[in-house]
Regions:
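Nucleotide phosphate-binding/pyrophosphate-handling subdomain across enzymes
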Residues: 1-71
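A general structural signal for well-ordered alpha-helical segments in protein cores
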Residues: 11, 32, 85-88, 101, ...
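Generic beta-sheet signal
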Residues: 20-21, 46-48, 95, 115-119, ...
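Short glycine-rich anion-binding loops that position phosphate/pyrophosphate groups of nucleotides
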Residues: 27, 53-55, 78-81, 123-125
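Active-site catalytic pocket residues across diverse enzymes, especially alpha/beta-hydrolases
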Residues: 39, 133-137
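C-terminal helical cap/extension that packs against the catalytic core
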Residues: 60-116
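A glycine-rich beta-strand to alpha-helix segment
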Residues: 104-134
Length: 137
C-alpha cells in the first residue's frame, strides 16, 4: 500500500506536461502557498497563467504567487463559476488579462522557451489545460 501511495500520480497535481509547462490544481490560498514553497528552488524564471472560480480568495493567492514570479497573467475558461474579465476588475491594473487561456499559455511558452510556465488557480482549469496540452506532446 505504501508503494502504491508513493507511485500515485494525481492528474493536474504538480504535473509537468513538458519540460516547460507545469499544471497544478491549487485552488485556495493554502494550496497556493504549498505550491509556491515547492517551486522556490526552481532555477529558472516562472511565468504564471492563473484562472479561478469567482468564490475564491484571489488576492491572497496572487500575493503568494508573486513570491516566485514577476509575470502573472489572468485568464478565464468555459465554466459558469469561472471568473471572467469583469470579475478581475480590481486586479487588471496590476495583471494582464487574456480572454483565451490558450493565448496566455502559448504566448508564455513561445516568448520564454527556456523558462517554466505554471498553470494554476483551479483544479478544473488545470485538468482542462492538462488534457489539451498533454495531447499536443
Amino acid at each position: 500500500m505504501y508503494e502504491g501511495l508513493l507511485n500515485n500520480n494525481l492528474p493536474a497535481r504538480f504535473e509537468y506536461i513538458s519540460d516547460h509547462l507545469l499544471v497544478d490544481g491549487a485552488h485556495n490560498p493554502d494550496a497556493i502557498i504549498e505550491l509556491v514553497n515547492s517551486l522556490k528552488n526552481i532555477n529558472k524564471p516562472i511565468h504564471v497563467v492563473f484562472a479561478c472560480f469567482r468564490d475564491k480568495n484571489i488576492e491572497r493567492m496572487l500575493i503568494s504567487l508573486g513570491e516566485i514570479s514577476n509575470d502573472i497573467v489572468l485568464t478565464t475558461f468555459n465554466h459558469n463559476r469561472a471568473r471572467n474579465e469583469e470579475d478581475y476588475f480590481l486586479y487588471l491594473g496590476d495583471y494582464k488579462f487574456y480572454q483565451d487561456y490558450h493565448d496566455a499559455i502559448d504566448n508564455a511558452l513561445n516568448n520564454y522557451p527556456d523558462d517554466l510556465v505554471l498553470v494554476c488557480g483551479s483544479l478544473y482549469f488545470a485538468e482542462l489545460v492538462r488534457s489539451e496540452y498533454k495531447n499536443e506532446k
